[in-house]
Amino acid sequence: CALITPWNWPMNQVTLKVCAAAVAGCTMVLKPSEESPLNAVLFAEMMHAAGFPPGVFNLVNGDGAGVGSQLSAHPDIDMVSFTGSTRAGKLISKSAADTLKRVHLELGGKGANLVFADADEKAVKRGVLRVMNNTGQSCNAPTRMLVEASRYDEAVEQAAETANNVTVGPGSAEGRHIGPVVNATQWQKIQD
């Protein structure tokens, strides 16, 4: 099977996909995101050190359009597991269709926080802080907040205060802050 992982939770997604495939007895080809390939290289070194037989776990690096599309269309690959964007998920599904391979997609959701009039007084603050987990770079981050009209003005004030109190610093520094986003493209998406 082909395992195609995202940049925003690289080691988490690599571990989840590889462990599931290994337990099922599958051989696998892992293609990590080109934005965060070093986690997968480290994981490959750990697999080798653990004594996995040659050919059971395989790592290829490259971009989605080039390498990912080749994996999803390859006739010797029976399944593709992909976590990432809806756009890429559609392309993988179309590419995989010609070989009738199974496709597993996790395309995120960006669910909403619902804040009703009787909600806990910390609901808005908690919701904003959940968005900031992983520097806000999560497919499941609740980036929308739907607030009952009677709490709206208060919620806007609380959300702004909470967001303005979040500090950005080096990812390697200790303390309570968020790190930088992965690249300029993602930073621009946040600004837009």
Predicted features by range, described:
Residues 2-123, 175:
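Rossmann-like NAD(P) dinucleotide-binding subdomain of oxidoreductase/dehydrogenase enzymes
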Residues 73, 79, 87-192:
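ALDH superfamily catalytic-core signature
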